[in-house]
């Protein structure tokens, strides 16, 4: 009995050793298999933060891209405003050039009519000069007076009397003398604000009413000289 038992024990022992070896091999394989997933998991865990960082960088880039168009739009708006500013600046000059032109026509029309009635011409002249912006200063008027007296030598007395009052004569002024002040008026109109013409406008009619007070003999003299 004991021998059988011993054999059995040995057999069991042999089997147990084989089974243990198998178990060890299986456990080793299992640990290796378990180790590889762990390594894979570790690599995946290491990759995930990098991927997250890459994803975070992408939104930052997108945010920068979105801000860049906004900046570009802002720059475009600024450039457009700058372009509009120079465009808006010449407008007063154009307006100033356009405004002095009607006075020229108004002054030439009385010349065509030979201006017998100084009273009718005075209001026209007052309206014409009132329409002019911050325009001819006293120096410009004196220059106009000097040029006109040179060109209108025969009618010097009447011209001097009327021009000494600071108003235009009933006779037509040469277009050359008017063109020069008009060019001078454009910078004055751009530099001077709109308040200056309003301030000077009331003073102009007061000076311009004086030609109407001058005797009509002056106008008769001018007509006689022209004839």
From Swiss-Prot:
Residues 15-27, 49-107, 137-150 have a biased composition (Basic and acidic residues). It is found in: Cell membrane; Cell projection, Growth cone. Residues 151-161 have a biased composition (Low complexity). The modification Phosphothreonine is found at residues 31, 36, 196. Residues 1-227 are annotated as: Disordered. It is a lipid-anchor. There is a cross-link at residues 25, 87, 99, 163 (Glycyl lysine isopeptide (Lys-Gly) (interchain with G-Cter in SUMO2)). GO terms for cellular component: cell junction; COP9 signalosome; cytoplasm; growth cone; nuclear matrix; nuclear speck; nucleus; plasma membrane. This is Brain acid soluble protein 1. The lineage of its organism: Eukaryota, Metazoa, Chordata, Craniata, Vertebrata. The gene is BASP1.
């Amino acid at each position: 009995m004991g021998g059988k038992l011993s054999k059995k024990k040995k057999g069991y022992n042999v089997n147990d050793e084989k089974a243990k070896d198998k178990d060890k091999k299986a456990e080793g394989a299992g640990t290796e298999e378990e180790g590889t997933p762990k390594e894979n998991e570790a690599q995946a865990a290491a990759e995930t933060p990098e991927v997250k960082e890459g994803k975070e960088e992408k939104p930052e880039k997108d945010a920068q891209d979105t801000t860049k168009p906004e900046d570009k739009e802002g720059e475009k708006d600024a450039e457009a405003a700058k372009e509009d500013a120079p465009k808006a600046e010449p407008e007063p000059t154009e307006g100033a050039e356009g405004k002095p032109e009607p006075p020229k026509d108004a002054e030439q029309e009385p010349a065509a009519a030979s201006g017998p009635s100084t009273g009718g011409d005075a209001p026209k002249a007052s309206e014409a000069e009132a329409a002019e912006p911050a325009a001819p200063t006293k120096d410009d008027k004196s220059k106009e007076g000097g040029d006109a007296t040179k060109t209108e030598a025969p009618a010097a007395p009447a011209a001097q009397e009327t021009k000494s009052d600071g108003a235009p004569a009933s006779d037509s002024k040469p277009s050359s003398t008017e063109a020069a002040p008009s060019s001078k008026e454009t910078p004055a109109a751009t530099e001077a604000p709109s308040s200056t013409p309003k301030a000077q406008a009331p003073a102009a009619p007061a000076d311009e009413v004086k030609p109407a007070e001058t005797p009509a003999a002056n106008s008769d003299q001018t007509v006689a000289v022209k004839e």
